[in-house]
Amino acid sequence: MRKIYLTILAFLSWAAMSVASFAIDVIVVSHGQANDPFWSVAKNGVDSACKDMKIKCKYTAPGTFDMVEMAKLIDNAVSQKPKGIVITLPDAAALGKSVKA
């Protein structure tokens, strides 16, 4: 849980930077589904921060807690070459290769 909070805090800190001079797109890859009570709060926070900072964000998560699917989502996010990628990391061993990409 601590890692999740630190990830969200890091994203919000990053989002607080001035973005007026350039367009930013960010992809958030979470292991928590947006329909889960906890993760719905996190997704709403991401959406709110992105709206406030006028940046384009996309929140993605696997349909269930699935590290293989999450790795695919991370790989897909990397291939889109956004300005930023924010991830949660519930299993570093399973996601390490995708994260290093």
Predicted segments with their positions:
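A residue-level marker of the well-folded mature domains of exported/periplasmic proteins
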Residues: 2-5, 21-101
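Bacterial N-terminal signal peptides
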Residues: 7-20
